[in-house]
């Protein structure tokens, strides 16, 4: 049985680890992987058809704990104890719920002190006791009319006993219903940069690079670290040194063994095998990959990841909050006779639906089907995705119409121009 400390409006944990409100989904998963001997079973629950419609949930079924993550930010919003009998809970070092200590209303009152009168739902027969950042739920079979005169003790029940808490919630703010995840805590930065948003830089219908708004740990102030934000630009043709100086060391370096999309290139059979292996810098906390040319070590491709559940790479990256402006499809000849339309653009984000995007942009008519598998697992339980080309961009689309990734390629003249400007 887990022995955990409750910190209202903040966390649930022990000396070795803790689940902190505002932490990213992947960080919670990392904790569970490190505690595999103590946390036996975990379920991932999400809406397969529309992952943005409801919370992303990690359920520790053998420990009575559920972690509810905001579907957009993928940060921890609510910590729920759905079975008080499966975990030992303490507050300020004093146990208030365990096999030996029953979490009655009187016990909660003794451990946490006075609060506002609770709320009784006669229809559901539920009594809820609220503190700031903390709520307890009690199932009550039958209650007399509550008289809130002297605090909790004024609530009377027919059999004279004190109801036992069946659930507990830890959240940010005063209201569980309106709770939202706080910003990523400084204690969860671990010296990594995090992405606030990314803008794709384009000119004359060609992609030039990306502009990143980053958040990282700044200089300490009175022994307390603080957040530091900055804006960086990366363009095609940038050197490895440029990328390292702007983004820092990557989370991982991956060398390409082969180009599986090469077969779709014109006259692919005439191309000589590459003597140098291209390589990726993977920035997991930015939701970004950058590909370098193996011969000249110049940046030639960006990959932006949206990290939706149901995708093969889910939980590997944080979501890349990108903005991409594309020219809208030209109106029909009949429409142009009636009105003179200036060139218009549409904005594509990590939350855009492909069926809405493809109606307004000129894309490749037939998609390429992408089957993903690893060397140790030749089956992909999430199924295939579909790749569509739009100018110098490839959109990877999931069966539910959400965009899984966006790949930005460099036009040769852009990459050459940028690399030459670096040499001047």
Task: Report the location of each language-model feature.
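Short helix/turn-capping signatures at newly exposed starts of structured segments
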Residues: 1-424
């Amino acid at each position: 049985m887990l022995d955990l400390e409750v910190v209202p409006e903040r966390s649930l944990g022990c000396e070795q680890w803790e689940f902190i409100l505002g932490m990213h989904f992947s960080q919670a998963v990392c904790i569970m992987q490190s505690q595999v001997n103590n946390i036996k079973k975990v379920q991932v629950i999400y809406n397969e058809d529309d992952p943005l419609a409801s919370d992303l949930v990690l359920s520790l079924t053998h420990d009575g704990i559920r972690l509810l993550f905001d579907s957009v930010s993928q940060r921890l919003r609510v910590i729920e104890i759905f079975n008080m009998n499966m975990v030992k809970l303490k507050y300020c070092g004093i146990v208030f719920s365990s096999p030996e200590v029953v979490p009655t209303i009187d016990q909660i009152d003794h451990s946490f002190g006075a609060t506002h009168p609770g709320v009784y739902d006669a229809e559901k027969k539920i009594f809820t006791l609220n503190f700031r950042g903390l709520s307890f739920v009690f199932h009550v079979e039958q209650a007399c009319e509550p008289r809130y005169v002297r605090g909790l003790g004024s609530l009377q029940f027919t059999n004279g006993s004190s109801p036992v808490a069946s659930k507990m919630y830890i959240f940010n703010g005063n209201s569980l219903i309106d709770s939202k995840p706080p910003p990523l805590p400084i204690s969860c930065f671990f010296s990594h940069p995090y992405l606030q948003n990314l803008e794709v830089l384009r000119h004359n219908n060609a992609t030039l690079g990306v502009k990143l708004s980053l958040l990282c740990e700044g200089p300490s102030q009175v022994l307390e670290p603080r957040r530091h934000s900055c804006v960086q630009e990366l363009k095609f043709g940038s050197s490895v040194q440029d990328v390292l100086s702007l983004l820092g060391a990557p989370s991982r370096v991956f060398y390409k063994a082969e180009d599986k999309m090469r077969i779709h290139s014109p006259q692919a059979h005439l191309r000589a095998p590459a003597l140098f292996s291209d390589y990726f810098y993977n920035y997991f906390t930015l939701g970004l990959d950058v590909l370098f040319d193996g011969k000249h070590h110049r940046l030639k491709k960006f990959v932006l990841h949206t990290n939706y559940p149901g995708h093969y790479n889910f939980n590997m990256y944080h979501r890349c909050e990108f903005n991409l402006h594309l020219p809208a499809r030209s109106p029909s000849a009949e429409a142009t006779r009636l009105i003179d339309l200036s060139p218009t653009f549409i904005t594509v984000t990590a939350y855009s639906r492909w069926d809405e995007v493809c109606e307004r942009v000129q894309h490749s008519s037939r998609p390429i089907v992408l089957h993903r598998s690893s060397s140790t697992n030749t089956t992909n339980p999430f199924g295939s995705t579909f790749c569509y080309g739009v100018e110098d961009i490839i959109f990877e689309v999931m069966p539910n119409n959400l965009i899984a990734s966006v790949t930005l390629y460099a036009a040769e003249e852009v990459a050459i121009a940028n690399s030459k400007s670096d040499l001047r």
